[in-house]
């Protein structure tokens, strides 16, 4: 596991490369890497994260959708307990997020569609939030507009770099 390797080599930081699931796994492991606890203790059992046990993470996303590269939330599945829950803590924010649209050029159309709709869902959720700021509403509207304009283009022509750039922009 990520956590086991981090502890074996006494990692000072980690680089997560991928979409939402690999990002979330790495965030959870980084949050407790210097300690001796198990992820389940924090994820399923509610143990508090000690920021002194965390190591920094660099997030390199290969999709445009989950926004995991810029959040402090990690959604994991505990298969033994049949639970899918979020864990979150300020220690889980990636220190650096690298969003390079060229890394999304090989994403299959069905993943492009589902992550693109995830971007739209995030934009609508942010816009409709009970507590929000006007700047957030403006960003949400802008993001939704980008999705409506560019998602179909990215889906129909996966190697359209401009469409991929605009979807990456919409996702953050």
Where would I find each of the regions flagged by the language model?
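Carboxylate- and glycine-rich phosphate/diphosphate-binding segment that chelates Mg2+/Mn2+
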Residues: 73-172
């Amino acid at each position: 596991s990520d956590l086991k390797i981090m502890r074996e080599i006494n990692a000072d930081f980690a680089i997560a490369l991928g979409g939402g699931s690999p990002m979330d796994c790495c965030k959870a492991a980084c949050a407790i890497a210097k300690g001796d606890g198990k992820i389940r203790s924090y994820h399923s059992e509610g143990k508090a994260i000690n920021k002194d046990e965390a190591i920094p993470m660099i997030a390199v996303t290969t999709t445009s959708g989950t926004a995991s590269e810029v959040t402090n939330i990690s959604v994991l599945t505990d298969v033994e307990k049949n639970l899918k829950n979020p864990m979150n803590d300020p220690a889980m924010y990636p220190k650096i997020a690298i969003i390079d649209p060229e890394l999304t050029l090989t994403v299959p159309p069905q993943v492009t569609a589902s992550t693109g709709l995830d971007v739209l869902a995030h934009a609508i959720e942010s816009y409709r939030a009970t507590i929000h700021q006007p700047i957030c509403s403006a960003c949400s509207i802008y993001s939704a507009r980008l999705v409506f304009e560019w998602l179909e283009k990215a889906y129909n022509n996966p190697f359209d770099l401009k469409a991929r750039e605009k979807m990456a922009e919409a996702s953050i």
